[in-house]
Amino acid sequence: MYDVADSAFTTVIVTALYALYFGTVVVGDPNQADYLWGWGASISEIIVAVVAPILGAIADFSGSRKKFLGVCALTIIFFTAALYFVGPGMVTLGLTLYIIANVGFAGGGVFIDSFLPGISTEQNAGKLSGIKWAMGYASGLLCLLLCFPLAKYIKANPTPYELSRAQLIPVVVAVYYAVAVIFPLIF
């Protein structure tokens, strides 16, 4: 299920550890970081709101929803992994990579939701959607647990060693996402 992959991104990158890394290490000012993080999320959602209807129509008309979903997945994987290169003071790079990855995430949501009518009936759509959500939630927690040992290295003014460990968090998420997304994209 695509939610198994997606929830790793939202739990670790958007909500918990990378948001903490961005504020503590990259920006260094929690208030400024929260402000920037909120703007980054808003910008990515506005981009998706503008282009999703157009891309959705193209995908429906051409029958290539799965290809568009694959592009969104590759966007998330590549730009999440690229967050590894963001260090102290690299606010613009960190925010730009996050915005692009989040566009991939939000865009993927548009396409994945369009598959539900084709794989369910009116009677079981709610149940199937609930199972999908539960599997995604559990997967997000699993990925968070995998990254949690690295979280202790998220510190203001980290040593080079601490920084190198904390920077592995988005790499773990990108690899986890890549493995989890294989099944829904192939079948």
Could you say what each language-model-derived stretch is?
Residues M1-E45, V91-L95:
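Helix-loop boundary and gating motifs at the non-cytosolic
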Residues I13, L17, D34-I58, F78, ...:
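Central cavity-lining transmembrane alpha-helices of secondary-active solute carriers
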Residues V48-A49, G126-A151:
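Glycine-rich segments within core transmembrane alpha-helices of 12-TM secondary carriers
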Residues A59-T75:
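Cytoplasmic membrane-interface "Motif A"-like loop-to-helix N-cap segments
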Residues A73, F79-F111:
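Hydrophobic core of transmembrane alpha-helices in multi-pass small-molecule transporters
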Residues A73-T80, G136, Y176-A180:
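MFS 12-TM fold signature
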Residues L97-M135:
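Cytoplasmic helix-loop-helix junction between adjacent transmembrane helices
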Residues C143-A156, A174-F187:
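C-terminal membrane-cytosol helix-exit motif in multi-pass small-molecule transporters
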